[in-house]
Amino acid sequence: MKVRDLMDKNFAKIYVDETVEDAINLLKKKKRFSAPIVDKEDRLVGWVTTLELLGISEKDFKKPITEFMRPVEEVITVYEDDEARNVVLKFVKYKVVSIPVLTRDGRVIGMVRNCDVVKTLAKLYEIPVYKIFKELHNHIGDISWEELMEAAAVVTKRMTGEDITPQEYEERIKKTTFGKAIWACGGLEKFFVGLIEIGMVALARKLAKRRKGG
């Protein structure tokens, strides 16, 4: 699943030549909490939230929104073709409510809200972990399924101290749902960190074998 599959396309977007009053009216109309500030080509230049707008004096309502926005350097972003797990990890790490979605050339094309991610994850909770590993396998190149399971056994030993064979690990993930795996790992972030670690170990072991064979 990609970030584009989670994003809200009906988002509030404020242009650099608009005023504070314009921003307030747009957020009210769209019923949104935050919005990106963009240039005429829809490239991100800043960010503003309702809480920040509430702190602005009425005498400043006609001033440019750019005087009150957060600069682009402080804005957490994701790309539309990023894996969905990347945005989940950013929500966990940075404790933000929403994140703008960019194209690779910097245009804002959507927003991902943490509430949307939660709804999507809720639908995924009954999916077997086996399917998530199959998706990982499809994305990490010329690693065989057996090599991925070997890496999973290595990472399990490293992280928990449990000795488990690759075959036993495969049987376990066939019987375990995404929801149960999150609970067993101690949270969503730890689950994805472990998953990423397995992929990295699989690639490292593959590279080591090639070097040894060469």
From Swiss-Prot:
Coiled-coil annotated residue ranges, if any? none
Keywords, A to Z, come to:
CBS domain, Repeat
Determine if Repeat is one of this entry's keywords.
yes
Q: What is this protein called?
A: Uncharacterized protein MJ1004
Q: Does the keyword Transcription regulation apply?
A: no
Species in which this protein is naturally found:
Methanocaldococcus jannaschii (strain ATCC 43067 / DSM 2661 / JAL-1 / JCM 10045 / NBRC 100440) (Methanococcus jannaschii)
What CDD domains does the record point to? CBS_pair_SF
Under the heading InterPro entries, the entry gives: CBS_dom, CBS_dom_sf, Diverse_CBS-Domain, UCP006591_CBS
Sequence ranges assigned to domain CBS in this UniProt record: 7-65, 69-129
One Pfam family assigned to this protein is CBS
The taxonomy runs:
Archaea, Methanobacteriati, Methanobacteriota, Methanomada group, Methanococci
